[in-house]
Amino acid sequence: MQGYTRWVLQAAIAASFASSCAYAQETIKIGHVAATSGAIAHLGKDNENGARMAVDEINAKGLTIGGKRYRLVLQAEDDAGDPKQGTTVAQKLVDAKVNGVIGHENSGTSIPASKIYFDAGIPQISPSASNPKYTRQGFNTAFRNVANDEQLGAALARYAVQVGKARQIAVIDDRTAYGKGLADEFIKNIKGSSARIVSQQYTTDRASDFGAILTTIKASKPDLIFFGGMDAVAGPMLKQMKQLGIKANFMGGDGMCSDSVPKLAGDGLADGQVICAEAGGVEPQQQKALDDFRAAYQRKFGVEVLTYAPYAYDALLTMVDAMQQAGSPDPAKYLPVLARIRHKGVTGTVAFDARGDVQNGVLTIYTFRGGKRQRLTVMK
């Protein structure tokens, strides 16, 4: 009897060990990287929430790939928007043997990190990095599901001149890969138009005092100030513009196109004064799916979507769709499928060109009224 009991116990332990091993083999680890600390932590958390929402939904429904059942695990990391920390985190994810990465959040961290993922053969989809260089380094593992700065800068310049009737434009950029890249594209597209650049100034992504550059700009009498940078800087800048009596309109890209701008600007923001563009958007026929996502997001997290949560959500679902079509979560096997995929998401159909840029990317132009973001139009 004791021998039988011992045998049963050993069998149970062996079964438990086998079950544990099987569970480990059935786990797919997806990395997510954004700045979840620092000045743009609110935007980073927005991205992370979008990815986490996708993971939770997939796990709730059950995931089968190649006839095997899997469970997704999101390994969320913080790069603080710092390129050096971004590469450190990227190597950490490679060492953790993640099956794919959603991120990084901004261009300054996505670009250096992309080399590390490429060397490891790990697919990476950024839901928000817009600098063209990110997908032009020859790395077949780098993708993005938002428009790039060439598209964004061109659309904003066109809107500024044709709709906003701007004629004298001052430009400020924060010297980051994102801010400088966007400002350069905007300036390039203004040249040859009926408008002209009357002043070009520089700041940093951590600055809080803009008195000197705004005083210089005021003397040039612009009717529009274009800012290449993030909302954490744009808000205080708008407040100081009012203090100096600068009544120009204010324009920027996706980095300053969140509901945080009115909060940071306070009474420095007039209704309709700010025009910004999100490097993504949906056609009217796709609006319901996006609205449903926003409602579900608010129910889950208790806050509204800021900017790129739906793109992080779609990026993760697109990656998993590629795994399912390939019949394997092995990066080497699903990467070729990801490159040619067409995934119907809440932000529209996600498909990539030969460089890894999203095909047929649209942009959404917004303003702010009553402290809330208001959509004006969708552009290509």
Predicted segments, located by residue:
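Extracytosolic ligand-binding ectodomains
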Residues: 2-11, 23-380
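N-terminal signal peptide c-region/cleavage motif recognized by signal peptidases
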Residues: 19-21
